[in-house]
Amino acid sequence: FASQYTEAELKKFEAGIYYDVYKKMGAHPMVINGVSGVSFSVWAPCAMRVSVVGDFCQWDGRRYQMNRLGDSGVFELFIPGLGEGDIYKFEIKNQKGEPMLKADPYGNYSEMRPNTASVVWDMNKFSWSDDAWMAAREKIDTKKKPMSIYEMHLGSWIRKHTEKDEEGNDIVGSEFYNYRQ
């Protein structure tokens, strides 16, 4: 299957100005030349090899080795027959030849803990309901507005646990904010 990236897109990516790269990176269900499957891509500039692994190949990194796109550090592969709900990771072979399993940094969905694999998910099926907010955002000059970056280590704030999940595990941070992922 042909690359899903154009030369112009790779140049924009290398320059750090490819603002829609999330539409290509990660796992995206699609049909190419009448064949249904999933297009995978990841940036791993120092990798010797990158493979897509999952139950569909018994987690064998030799089966679905990705194609390196020139010197961009981007690897990609289209795997026919895969689709929404399939779990996967990237097997990245480092400079020492050691394979490491990594979740997809652009993944849209993940397994529930304690498992850590990414899950193929079609984000095109999601119906966004933020049209008014997006329209208002276009009228704002963000370069002239303040920006807030909030970073904290929740562990350093723990004094007591006030909430537990369905399995009886403590939910950290329940007293600090009302949304957690």
Name each region found by the language model.
Residues 174-181:
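Short, intrinsically disordered, charge-balanced linker/junction segments flanking boundaries
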Residues 50-52, 88:
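Short beta-strand elements bearing conserved aromatic residues within extracellular beta-rich modules
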Residues 1-35, 67-174:
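The feature marks proteins involved in alpha-glucan
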Residues 44, 59-61, 77:
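Beta-strand-enriched, solvent-exposed domains that form extended recognition/catalytic surfaces
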Residues 36-41:
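Structural beta-strand segments of beta-rich domains
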Residues 43-50:
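Short proline/glycine-enriched turn/loop motifs at strand-loop junctions of beta-rich domains
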Residues 46, 60, 84-86:
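Short loop/turn segments at connectors of secondary-structure elements within structured domains
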